[in-house]
Amino acid sequence: RINGTMLPADRWPVLADRVMEAAPNLTYFEFLTALGLLAFAEAGVDLVVMEAGLGGHYDATTAMPVQAVCFTPIGMDHEKILGPTLTDIASDKSQAMRPGVPAFTAPQEAEALDCLLRTAQEKGAELRETASLPFPQSALGLAGPHQRVNARLAIAVWDWLADQHHWPNMPETAAKGLASAHFPGRFQRIPACNGLPPLILDGAHNPHGLRAFETAVRDADIQPAAVIFSCLADKDISDMLPFIRRIAGDAPLFVPTIQDNERAMNGEELAKLLAEGRGPAITQPTQRLSLALKETASFVPAEDADRHPVLLCGSLYLLGEFFNLHPQTLEQ
């Protein structure tokens, strides 16, 4: 996205050809990182925010110089690559720090914070903790209490960058930005339209994300009419199952198999695991997401539908499949 607008479809192949011509042997994420940087350079942007894809030691985003490094709350994910413990994961992520470059962190579990502090000392980076800063009092465009934690981190980094570059930094402008923030697939509400039931989309695909999603659902007083969930086979599903069962409650739970992804977990196998302990509640596998969406529509009540939407959560690849089916929902 550049200034909140998705990169036009016709620019992707043009930029991709230039990257492939210059560096034909890049990995997938190296390729996407290079393509993004090329797009940003052509647009002449003043500020780029890049999200690491996997850890911080060997992630493609570490190839570029940076002015600041940010750590949102670190949780369990990608254990097969980064390691089986939170310390392993935090140690890898901490390698994103650079000598002399300030690093900002949201509140962390004790072992994760220890890793960040140790690496900061080893690399000569100043680690700035944001836990003691006040929460932004303005309304947020992104739902859930965890987004206030993220917003506090974003404001801390922005204040520092604005001071360094002598950019205008008016509180009312920051408040407007927080209120208008939009992130597809992060507690994203989609009203009933074009045959779709009312939906809330969330890319929660690990225990850390599902805990935040569960809290956001509860705080919004949402009682789902149905839930659609799926994930990749290389995820540690055992720690995610209790969250999905609690989020769904007695509502029907539909489990599609993510299409065109060799890492996708089979919907029937995942449904069997999720059905354990759900009693008579419906837990039904479907061959694909489009079928699950059709099935869930009949469970949405005619009245108070906003309080009883269908929750679509899990793998970002599942959400990607949804956005391919309904591209108009990507925009705010």
Where are these regions (language model features)?
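Short, high-confidence coil segments that cap the C-terminus of an alpha-helix
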Residues: 24, 45-46, 222, 305-307
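Nucleotide phosphate-binding/pyrophosphate-handling subdomain across enzymes
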Residues: 47-50, 60-62, 66-70, 74-75, ...
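Conserved catalytic-core segment of NTP-binding enzymes
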Residues: 54-58, 65-123, 240
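Flexible, gly/pro- and Lys/Arg-enriched active-site loops
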Residues: 56, 60-63, 74-83, 255-274, ...
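C-terminal helical cap/extension that packs against the catalytic core
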Residues: 106-128, 198-200, 241-309
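Active-site-proximal loop/hinge segments that shape catalytic or ion-binding/gating pockets
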Residues: 315
